[in-house]
């Protein structure tokens, strides 16, 4: 059962990690392809909105008698934000177009969410990236 749960979590994280990797490589000095990075950011935006809107299943699974049998650690929006934005931001803020697009994307995600906790998580990530982008522009 544990392996199966890890596979599900990995299945959700894998495409995020791949898109981040593609975007980071596209922003490398040797490639310098912000268009590809921006396309990856758009795909990440769509994925994060979909993941945020997924209904949360109970973290405790019970048997027929109501006895708790499995307690699962749930991946939440903050985990996916960290995987996507947290890993990509250091590369994106070095490119003005990609950095600005990432900030706008976080605004789009925030505007699409109704849950106040999720909005706060995205807003915090937005503010962090916007600060980094502003500090890069001052250099």
What does each model-found stretch correspond to?
Residues 1-139:
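Short basic (Lys/Arg) and small-residue
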């Amino acid at each position: 059962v544990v392996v199966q749960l890890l596979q599900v979590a990995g299945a959700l994280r894998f495409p995020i990690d791949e898109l981040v990797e593609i975007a980071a490589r596209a922003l490398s000095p040797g490639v310098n392809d912000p268009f590809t990075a921006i396309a990856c950011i758009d795909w990440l935006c769509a994925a994060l909105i979909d993941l945020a809107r997924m209904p949360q299943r109970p973290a405790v699974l019970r048997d027929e008698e109501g006895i708790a049998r499995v307690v699962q650690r749930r991946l939440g929006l903050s985990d996916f934000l960290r995987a996507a934005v947290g890993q990509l931001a250091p590369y994106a803020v070095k490119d003005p177009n990609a950095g600005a697009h990432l900030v706008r994307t976080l605004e789009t995600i925030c505007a699409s969410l109704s849950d106040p906790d999720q909005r706060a998580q995205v807003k915090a990530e937005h503010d962090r990236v916007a600060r980094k982008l502003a500090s890069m522009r001052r250099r």
